[in-house]
């Protein structure tokens, strides 16, 4: 017992000596001018040492090593506390929003023609505001006035080309109602609304479960999706685009990934568990593609495909050790989606972001809107419905609508007969028609999005000076798929004909 007391006493004396040495170093640095300030420094050092060395022993009598051990203990405690903060759901949601916006702004080359405006409004606030103006008063809501009347509805205004919502939607009645109201506003202002789908839209807890269902289409045939199906069949739903899944916003913090200068922080991330990673809404990635296409070509037509504007490059690539001793890479898009599943998702109105295996590259293969294209007895009518439900074609049509309203507004009051107006509009629209679509390059087709166009102007009976106009626009078709048949033959078909 006496020996134990002697050891404790010796350890206490050593601790006091090390604390005094550390205090003397700080006194030389701070140089307190009063005795009270000197005592404050010594008290702070003593308290710090007691907390840091609680339930521990000094490494040696070396003051430097003792200080390093104190710092290491503090770093460990700070790491545990910061991990709890950063992995809290509220903090993750906040970081996701800022990281996504940062990604959009940093990857967009803005100028006087391409601008980004941010409206800070939460999803519940947006729904609450629009819900007050349902029915015939939908165009009286402050959201409609802010987005439509202040720009597209104003002389000299600059209409929005696209709306991006950092939200996640599913088949719940409030979400279906909100999407329906946003579809009305987007259709009126001719600006598609791009947001994201939640995994709960398919009854999943996360996108990690996407490969489990055998048939995705069957999920949407149940009674609880009645409102969702009705929304997809509406005319205005073609202005809604829902992306999925999320993409990795940053690498985890750590000495080997993204060092923190302030202290030795190691972010705790389980490679197999996606909940501790920082994810961003993939609607931002689609928005970057839309902005890039507009910047390069003046039109938002090249926004999909690996080689035609749909690529998402430079995603964070995080590798981690596996249980079997190997090294694996965290999928930067939550889950790898197969070609067959991508086709199913596009058929059901989603825009999946596909990751290229073992790379930092992903791409939007399709750009299908939420709308389910109608099927008619006339094949041409069905083909027109399919075109109208795809965003690259819709963006071009919306841009023409923006220009036409400004053009007609400027012509009001001038002396224009029907034939003269039709001829003038026809000449104007031909500026955006590719003269030789069969031999034009991809760049030329992107700059001239139409393969053919025709304008018809008709007089309104009983109302002189008023005309009805119809624009028939035939865009360049984009490759949707190719069925390949391989056959071994003794002679080629061309050789037989010869």
Curated annotation (Swiss-Prot):
Q: What happens when the gene is disrupted?
A: Deletion mutant shows a clear reduction in E. coli killing and a lack of ability to secrete Hcp1, VgrG1a as well as Tse3.
Tree of life domain: Bacteria
Instruction: Report the InterPro entries cross-referenced here.
Output: T6SS_TssC-like (IPR010269), TssC1_C (IPR044032), TssC1_N (IPR044031)
* Domain-level remarks: The C-terminal region is required for cogwheel and tubule formation.
The entry's function note states: Core component of the H1 type VI (H1-T6SS) secretion system that plays a role in the release of toxins targeting both eukaryotic and prokaryotic species. Forms the sheath of the structure by assembling into tubules together with TssB1 resulting in the stacking of cogwheel-like structures showing predominantly a 12-fold symmetry. The sheath contracts to provide the energy needed for effector delivery.
Q: How does it assemble?
A: Forms a heterodimer with TssB1. Heterodimers assemble to form the sheath of the T6SS machinery. Interacts with TssA1.
UniProt-recorded name of the protein: Type VI secretion system sheath protein TssC1
Q: Which organism is it from?
A: Pseudomonas aeruginosa (strain ATCC 15692 / DSM 22644 / CIP 104116 / JCM 14847 / LMG 12228 / 1C / PRS 101 / PAO1)
- From which lineage does this chain's organism come? Bacteria, Pseudomonadati, Pseudomonadota, Gammaproteobacteria, Pseudomonadales
């Amino acid at each position: 017992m006496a020996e134990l007391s002697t050891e404790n006493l010796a350890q206490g004396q050593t601790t006091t000596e090390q604390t005094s040495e550390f205090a003397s170093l700080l006194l030389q640095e701070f140089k307190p001018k009063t005795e009270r300030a000197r005592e404050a420094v010594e008290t702070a050092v003593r308290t710090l040492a007691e907390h840091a060395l609680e339930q521990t022993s000094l490494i040696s009598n070396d003051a430097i090593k003792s200080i390093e051990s104190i710092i290491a203990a503090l770093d460990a405690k700070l790491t545990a506390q910061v991990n709890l903060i950063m992995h809290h759901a509220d903090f993750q949601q906040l970081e996701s929003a800022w990281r996504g916006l940062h990604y959009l702004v940093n990857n967009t080359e803005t100028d006087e023609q391409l601008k980004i405006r941010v409206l800070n409004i939460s999803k519940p606030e947006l729904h609450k505001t629009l819900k007050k103006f349902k029915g015939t008063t939908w165009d009286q809501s402050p959201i409609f006035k802010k987005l439509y009347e202040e720009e597209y509805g104003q002389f000299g205004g600059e209409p929005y080309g696209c709306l991006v919502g950092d939200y996640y939607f599913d088949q719940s009645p409030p979400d279906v109602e909100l999407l329906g109201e946003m579809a009305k506003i987007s259709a009126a202002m001719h600006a598609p609304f791009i947001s994201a789908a939640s995994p709960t839209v398919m009854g999943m807890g996360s996108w990690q479960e996407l490969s489990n269902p055998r048939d995705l289409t069957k999920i949407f045939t149940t009674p609880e999706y009645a409102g969702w199906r009705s929304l997809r069949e509406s005319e205005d739903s073609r202005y809604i685009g829902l992306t999925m899944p999320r993409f990795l916003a940053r690498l985890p913090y750590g000495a080997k990934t993204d060092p923190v200068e302030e202290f030795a922080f190691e972010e705790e991330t389980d490679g197999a568990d996606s909940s501790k990673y920082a994810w961003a809404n993939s609607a931002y990635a689609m928005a970057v593609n839309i902005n890039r296409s507009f910047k390069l070509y003046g039109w938002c037509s090249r926004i999909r495909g690996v080689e035609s504007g749909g690529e998402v490059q430079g995603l964070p690539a995080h590798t981690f050790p596996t249980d079997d001793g190997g090294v694996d890479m965290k999928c930067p898009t939550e889950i790898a989606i197969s070609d067959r599943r991508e086709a199913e998702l596009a058929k059901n109105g989603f825009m999946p972001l596909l990751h290229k295996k073992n790379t930092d590259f992903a791409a939007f293969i399709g750009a299908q809107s939420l709308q389910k294209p109608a099927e008619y007895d006339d094949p041409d009518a069905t083909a027109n419905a399919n075109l109208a439900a795809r965003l690259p074609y819709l963006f071009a049509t919306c841009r023409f609508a923006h220009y036409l309203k400004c053009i007609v507004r400027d012509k009001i009051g001038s002396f224009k007969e029907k034939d003269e107006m039709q001829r003038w509009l026809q000449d104007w629209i031909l500026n955006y028609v590719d003269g030789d679509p069969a031999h034009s390059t991809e760049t030329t087709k992107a700059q001239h999005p139409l393969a053919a166009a025709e304008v018809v102007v008709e007089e309104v009976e009983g109302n002189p000076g008023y005309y009805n106009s119809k624009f028939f626009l035939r865009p360049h078709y984009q490759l949707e798929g190719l069925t390949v048949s391989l056959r071994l033959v003794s002679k080629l078909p061309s050789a037989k004909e010869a």
